[in-house]
């Protein structure tokens, strides 16, 4: 899969002194070893893993991680989810709350597109308002596709999320009341 213009194509095997800067240089052998170590660890401990793509923003790397056993990929923004989906990634979780209706409509369209390819999109929420706005965007999409919803738990930093316990349960129940939203778990 090629997603870059010819001038920006990967230069695998190129001598470092011939590479124009700025450039990302990756030791492919070390990357493969690290991916395999993480996959082996997850299998040994019987855990599902979903790496974050906020640093590499690479569909190719996300697909390699999924081939090694990652459940999917995490991103911070709708635009990052759209870019990875365009590169072939089909299981994406947006780990930040999305509140603006234009972005929620984009997320709803993306959820529909991913569902049509056997994929799924998830979004984090930490308020009843966020759930209602997400449900509204999904309803307005005109699609029967659903969206996974993760209730974000505040881990004590006071940045985002709801306290554990009753507030989290209340949000999970609020998600369950909407036909196109699926409670997919907690995020902390």
Feature locations, PLM:
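N-terminal glycine-rich anion-binding loops that anchor highly charged ligand groups
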Residues: 7-11, 30-61, 74-76
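Mobile beta-alpha loop/short-helix "lid" or hinge segments that flank ligand
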Residues: 6-8, 187-188
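Short, surface-exposed alpha-helical recognition segments that flank or form part
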Residues: 26-29, 122
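Short, solvent-exposed beta-strand edge segments and adjacent coil->beta transition regions
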Residues: 19-21, 46, 118-120
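Generic N-terminal amphipathic, Lys/Arg-enriched alpha-helix
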Residues: 7-26
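Active-site-proximal beta-alpha core segment in soluble small-molecule metabolic enzymes
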Residues: 52-188
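N-terminal hydrophobic targeting/anchoring segments and the immediately downstream early-domain regions
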Residues: 1-5
């Amino acid at each position: 899969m090629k997603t870059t213009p010819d001038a920006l194509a990967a230069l695998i095997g190129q001598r470092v002194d011939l590479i124009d800067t700025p450039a990302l240089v990756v030791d492919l052998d070390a990357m493969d070893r690290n991916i395999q170590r993480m996959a082996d660890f997850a299998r040994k401990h019987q855990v599902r893993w979903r790496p974050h793509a906020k640093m590499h923003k690479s569909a190719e790397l996300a697909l390699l991680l999924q081939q090694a056993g990652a459940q999917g990929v995490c991103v911070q923004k709708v635009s990052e989810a759209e870019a990875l989906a365009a590169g072939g990634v089909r299981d994406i979780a947006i780990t930040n709350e999305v509140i603006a209706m234009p972005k929620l409509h984009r997320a709803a369209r993306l959820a529909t597109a991913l569902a049509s390819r056997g994929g799924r999109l998830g979004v984090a929420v930490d308020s009843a308002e966020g759930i209602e706005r997400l449900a509204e965007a999904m309803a307005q999409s005109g699609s029967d596709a659903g969206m996974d919803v993760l209730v974000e738990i505040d881990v004590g930093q006071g940045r985002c999320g709801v306290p554990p316990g009753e507030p989290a349960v209340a949000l999970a129940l609020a998600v369950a009341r909407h036909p196109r939203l699926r409670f997919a778990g907690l995020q902390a």
